[in-house]
Amino acid sequence: MAILVTGGAGYIGSHTCIELLNADYEVVIVDNFSNSNPIALQRVQQITGKTIKVYEIDLLNELELERVFQENSIEAVIHFAGLKAVGESVVNPLLYFEKNLISTISLCTVMQKYNVKNIVFSSSATVYGLPETLPITEDFPLEVRNPYGRTKRMIEEMLHDVYISDSSWSISILRYFNPIGAHESGLIGEDSIGIPNNLMPYITKVAIGELKELNVFGNTYETSDGTGVRDYIHVCDLANGHVAALKKTIEMNEVGIFNLGTGRGYSVLEVLRAFESATSLTVPYKVCDPRPGDVAIYYADATRAFKELGWKAKKSLEEMCKDAWRWQLNNPNGYLKRKKQSTSSK
């Protein structure tokens, strides 16, 4: 039996494929490579010494997707594929509803047709909106503030309705916080385009000289140093969280929602100083105006994942920094050969 990974060539998807292969799962990948690169999958095979089956397919193409289920004995699906830029979603919401929500409907329709009813869904902590208290538990009220987050919430609700209609489905919804770092080999990592939206690739691109300085958005928040605090989690810990959720999903018929985070927040300047300490480099920065909608502090309560999945984040901030820098140093131009720019794989 095989595990189908949608968006498996993306940042989180490729790291999860490594952990699946290391756990002796057979892996089948569907990816349209609109914001990922087949080279990532070549390197996954290089790291693990195992082969993976890859289909270059858009999830909206149900006929092609059916072929994947016809040609493979699929036991469960881990669903990463989707657009992920908050700013872009505000400018082009219809694109996000099509590529995130409609594509998931297409996927679930085909899954149901072929009686594959185990799915792990890659959601996001963006569904929580502005927290009133901390840490953030899974029972927090949902308050999405942009079309990207809205697609995640709508998919979560849709999956709940699917389960209510047919309790033979088993569904795990993973809400994770801020993945950073890279595989310790330095062969795969976050291959961002232009000026990154995320902190760590921004830092590494400044450190390597591709960008002039780091923009720190706001230094007057009510935090220890005035900069925003987030829950940063090593991407390999996050990948292992997906494997843990997969095991439970296959064993149980239920809907489970889990935060994946470290349970500790670090400020922007704390991450910057940790990176400088781990690499013996100095990263120039300037303070800019806060971004609209940003909150001061945001971190997870991951107790449920520990109790029910037996999962806990293990890697330190220092390891996250060292691994991210190793990836950037070994791959200054990312995976080099990009087919086209978009945002469809995690």
Label the predicted regions.
Residues 1-182:
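N-terminal Rossmann-like NAD(P)+-binding domain of SDR-like oxidoreductases, especially those catalyzing
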Residues 38, 178-198, 209-230:
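Short, flexible, glycine-rich and Lys/Arg-enriched loop motifs at helix boundaries
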Residues 57, 61, 195-196, 264, ...:
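Residue-level signature of the cytosolic catalytic core of signaling kinases
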Residues 97, 145-153, 189, 193-197, ...:
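Short-chain dehydrogenase/reductase
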Residues 202-346:
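C-terminal substrate-binding subdomain of Rossmann-fold SDR/epimerase-dehydratase oxidoreductases
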